[in-house]
Amino acid sequence: TKLIKVNTLSYKTVSANKETVEKEWFVVDAKDVVLGRLASVVAMVLRGKHKPSFTPHVDCGDNVIIINADKIKMTGKKMTDKQYIRHSGYPGGQRTQTPEDLLSKKPEAVVERAIKGMLPKSRLGSEMFRNLFVYAADTHPHEAQQPKELDLNKIK
């Protein structure tokens, strides 16, 4: 029998850590995009699940900039019928708001809330959420990072 020498490193699972993760910058135009479809793709990119080096316990996701958040679309009657509920902690302190009201006051909040709900509910999820930058206008202050255009249809 012939003995074959194999490089043992090739059989090791590579686990990413803070030092080895390479973060990229992406920009997404939210104009006329359905909110849930945008949020699910962006949440996946923020987590890093689109990378072969994805490690669940490490923030290996990329930075995402979303522009035109005020021009987001919702299907059906969600813009008027959906309710965002919050509570102050006091008796009778429950408040509701429709996406229509929220878009008129703070357009970024609708997109941020949808994406935050799709991230892990932990310290790591909070850390990932800090890599998201949402702007209502079609400009952003991150030109120095040279963000790439993110095609929502290519990443599944």
Task: Tell what function each PLM region has.
Residues 134-142:
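Short, highly charged C-terminal tails/helix-capping segments
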Residues 122-135:
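C-terminal structural segments of small proteins and small subunits
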Residues 111-112, 116, 129:
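Hydrophobic, well-ordered secondary-structure segments
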